[in-house]
């Protein structure tokens, strides 16, 4: 056996040497600088170790190689973009030259082939994007959902008041409750088990694992998709099958449930219902899958970025009490000490608006942006970006560049306000949600929800660390990153504020949840 391995390795090395000797001389400009390429495998061993925050690992490339760096793995060129202005020039202003979506064999195996992150059928991709833009892609479109947002955020305050130690759970539940209501007309259970909510959470967790850069060997060696699951090293086949079962249920259960409601004459307004009524969708057709995935993208994409941003906001308020005090003073002065702000107040609250921008800058929800693929050779600053190269923007380095942001590690909303001697620093909204035609379609949902949660939380609560000497938490690795464990005290400012929070119970009593109905539907259709 060992001799066979040695012979194979020797043959591969010989072929590699022969290819180098016989290959015609390349007269094109060089690739951007990067670590030395090893024979055959290239930079396969130069990826971040498991559990390492990828954006911090790749930030070292900026220190060593400058605004652009490159790697190669099995013939695939990867260009790391470490400079915001360069990212805007290449992936936004010239987005037509790099709008293709990278191939992701594992994602397709895991049932995520229709996701915006992987769908390579241009017409399907455009349809999903167009549907999302129409429903949530502009501030005008989002304004139709303001009443739902306001009610949901007030319920979030109530849950936090009653059980502040479960703050992270409340943040996630509020974000998902809103998206599931908008997308499906679904009311989650305020307390207790909810199978559709649990299924959505499971899908979101799996999403981060599926799309984690460098995680799956089959993405580098696509031929491995044909290896049986029992073969040594092919455990990814088992994971792919598990994830596929989850996402198929998560996408199809609410769709079939709404179709059942329509048949029974008891459907409620939702994005999915509006799209369903616009056309006829054959069961099992590609058009049906486009419809189903449009709403899955609404729910999963919109909720997880919001959870990340809101979690980072609470950590920032605890670590920077002076910022919290200034925000509260502005709200008390403009809105009143025992009145809750609305979206109409935003133009009168410049410090809160700057605070929202600083949350996005301080720790972007997606520290590594969505990758793009070049569609033709491009030359930038004397370096070649070859056709088919994967462009990977390190958003974290964009937002922590000391030449753009003074004291970038410090949470300082004032950087976005007009100063007596200094103009506002660059608005991070230009790049934290992506570039060009791959920009996050749900960015306005996250922005507006963070604004109102910041207003209400600062108005009603004092936020502080349980351990006054606790350092800033680590941020967890993943496609969508969130702060690690960090215990907070969240207490009402006064009895009057507690009464204000509890007024939601009489203003908008809890609605009957759909959890029991969906559980029965799933059991009846053998979808559990």
From Swiss-Prot:
Its EC number is 1.14.14.117
Question: What is the stated purpose of this protein?
Answer: Converts O-methylsterigmatocystin (OMST) to aflatoxin B1 and converts dihydro-O-methylsterigmatocystin (DHOMST) to aflatoxin B2 in the aflatoxin biosynthesis pathway.
The residues that the entry says bind heme are: 440
Cross-referenced CDD domains, in alphabetical order? CYP64-like
Q: Which SUPFAM superfamilies match?
A: Cytochrome P450
Q: In which pathway does it act?
A: Mycotoxin biosynthesis; aflatoxin biosynthesis
UniProt record similarity statement: Belongs to the cytochrome P450 family.
Q: Under which name does UniProt file this protein?
A: O-methylsterigmatocystin oxidoreductase
* Protein source organism: Aspergillus flavus
Single GO molecular function:
heme binding
Q: Note one Pfam family from the annotation.
A: p450
- Cofactor(s) for this UniProt protein: heme
Q: Which cysteines are joined by disulfide bonds?
A: none
Quote the annotated effect of residue 517 to H: In strain: ATCC 96044 / SRRC 1273 / AF13
**What reaction is this protein's catalytic activity?**
8-O-methylsterigmatocystin + 2 reduced [NADPH--hemoprotein reductase] + 2 O2 = aflatoxin B1 + methanol + 2 oxidized [NADPH--hemoprotein reductase] + CO2 + H2O + 2 H(+); 8-O-methyldihydrosterigmatocystin + 2 reduced [NADPH--hemoprotein reductase] + 2 O2 = aflatoxin B2 + methanol + 2 oxidized [NADPH--hemoprotein reductase] + CO2 + H2O + 2 H(+)
InterPro entries associated with the record: Cyt_P450 (IPR001128), Cyt_P450_CS (IPR017972), Cyt_P450_E_grp-I (IPR002401), Cyt_P450_sf (IPR036396), Cytochrome_P450_fung (IPR050364)
Which keywords are on file for this protein? Heme, Iron, Metal-binding, Monooxygenase, Oxidoreductase
């Amino acid at each position: 056996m060992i001799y066979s391995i040695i012979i194979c390795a020797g043959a591969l090395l010989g072929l590699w040497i022969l290819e180098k000797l016989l290959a015609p001389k390349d007269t094109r400009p060089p690739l951007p600088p990067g670590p030395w390429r090893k024979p055959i495998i290239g930079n396969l061993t130069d990826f971040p170790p498991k559990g390492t925050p990828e954006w911090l690992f790749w930030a070292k490339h900026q220190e060593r190689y400058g605004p652009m760096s490159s790697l190669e793995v099995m013939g695939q060129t990867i260009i790391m973009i470490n400079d915001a202005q360069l990212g805007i020039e290449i992936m936004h202003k010239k987005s037509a030259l790099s709008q293709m979506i990278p191939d992701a064999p594992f994602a397709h195996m895991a049932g995520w082939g229709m996701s915006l992150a992987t769908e390579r059928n241009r017409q399907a991709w455009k349809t999903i994007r167009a549907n999302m833009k129409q429903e949530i892609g502009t501030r005008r479109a989002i304004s139709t959902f303001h009443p739902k947002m306001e009610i949901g955020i007030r319920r979030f305050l109530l849950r936090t008041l009653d059980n502040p130690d479960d703050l992270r759970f409340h943040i996630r539940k509020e974000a998902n409750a809103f998206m599931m209501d908008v997308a499906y007309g679904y009311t989650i259970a305020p307390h207790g088990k909810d199978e559709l909510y649990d299924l959505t959470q499971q899908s979101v967790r799996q999403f981060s694992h599926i799309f984690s850069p460098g995680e799956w060997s089959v993405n580098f060696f696509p031929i491995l998709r044909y290896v049986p699951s029992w073969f040594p090293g092919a455990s990814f086949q088992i994971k792919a099958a598990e994830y596929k079962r989850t996402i198929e249920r998560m996408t199809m259960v609410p769709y079939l449930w709404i179709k059942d409601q329509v048949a029974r004459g008891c459907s409620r307004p939702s994005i999915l219902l509006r799209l369903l009524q616009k056309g006829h969708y054959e069961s099992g057709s590609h058009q049906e899958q486009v419809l189903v995935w449009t709403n899955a993208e609404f729910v999963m994409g919109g909720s997880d970025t919001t959870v990340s941003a809101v979690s980072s906001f609470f950590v920032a308020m605890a670590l920077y009490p002076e910022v919290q005090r200034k925000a509260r003073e502005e709200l008390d002065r403009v809105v009143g000490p025992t009145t809750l702000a609305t979206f109409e107040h935003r133009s009168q609250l410049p410090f809160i608006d700057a605070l929202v921008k600083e949350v996005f800058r301080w720790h972007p929800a997606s520290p590594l942006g969505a990758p793009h693929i070049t569609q033709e050779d491009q030359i930038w600053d004397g370096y070649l970006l070859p056709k088919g190269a994967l462009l990977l923007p390190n958003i974290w380095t964009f937002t922590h560049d000391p030449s753009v942001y003074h004291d970038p590690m410090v949470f300082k909303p004032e950087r976005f306000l007009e100063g007596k001697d200094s103009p506002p620093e660059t608005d991070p909204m230009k790049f934290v949600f992506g570039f060009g035609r791959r920009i996050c379609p749900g960015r306005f949902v996250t922005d507006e929800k963070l604004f109102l949660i910041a207003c209400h939380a600062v108005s009603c609560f004092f936020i502080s660390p349980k351990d006054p000497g606790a350092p800033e938490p680590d941020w967890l690795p993943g496609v969508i990153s969130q702060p690690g464990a960090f215990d907070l005290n969240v207490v009402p400012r006064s009895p009057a504020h507690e009464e204000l929070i509890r007024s939601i119970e009489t203003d908008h009593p809890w609605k009957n949840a759909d959890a029991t109905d969906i559980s029965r539907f799933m059991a009846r259709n053998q979808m559990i």
